[in-house]
Amino acid sequence: MEERVERATKASRAFALVAAPVLVALVALPWWSDAGWMRLIAEMAYYLALAQLWNLLAGYAGLVSVGQQAYVGLGGYALFYLTGAQNMNVYLALAIAGPFAGLIAIPVSFAVFRLRGAYFAVGTWVMSEVFALSASLIAVLGAGSGLSLTPAILRQISPDRSSRDAILYLMSLAISVVVCAIVYLLLRSRHGLALTAIRDSEPASASLGVNTFRTKFIIYVATAACTGLIGALIFLQKLRISPEAGFSINDWTVVVIFMVVIGGIGTIEGPFIGMLVYITLRELLADYGTIYLILMGMIAIAVMLKAPSGIWGWVVQRYDLQLFPVGRRLVLAPPTPPQTSER
């Protein structure tokens, strides 16, 4: 028997064949659907991106942060300040918002990395509250009332509202696809192996030569930068930002944690499932106020009791399906018969 290493699975190949036309249809959505669907799918796209980033932190690097809303707010405020007070072009401000959030994450990481376990989670939340309180006290940021985008800024995107909606939708879709692709490729690399080693046992991974601090530092800062860019795009669509909205733990962290835990933490597929569950519940129960939050809590408890590894974790355990395989499999195959040439 011959041995060969495979990374793809039958399920992943079939999924790629299905996902490609779906992605093409989503890209073409502005030409065959209305603004309502574009706004909904754009929201699904940036929630998926946020969930993948938090899953990378908690599910693979073992950094259970409950303060990622800090970088959503920082990215949003950077966009509004640069376009408003500094009269910067909106696209340039978008490009700066992400690196700005990543830059702020550098000193934050040195503070919170001194903490472990639940203390790390609490520390990230405290830092987020510090940013929210600071924003509510700074007059140039609108203090407690926040900031709004002017019509002149919106015209930089497009003078036509329908074209502007289409551009913002495509930007949301693009950032979601890029984030998912980066996470997938990262986890397939040696850096992904280092992340999972740190998550499973930091002392053991350090003894094997993994630079644990540098690896966690890079992942934390990179996810903060991506989260800041997503936050800027979110509030560019919402047209207004305030400390309560930008640094909301419920909107940008609790919901994301729900998606990841329900779908399956430590899997790329999990955030997809969790996002669909959350959006479906919210849309079906939209007429009942916040009752969907109660139902979300009940579903979360039920899933954690019946399937601690999440919905996709249960699927993997039962059916061994992997749509985004990140590991390697050793496959035994019959030897290839030698070719004989006829004379």
Could you say what each language-model-derived stretch is?
Residues 1-343:
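Transmembrane alpha-helices and adjacent helix-loop boundaries
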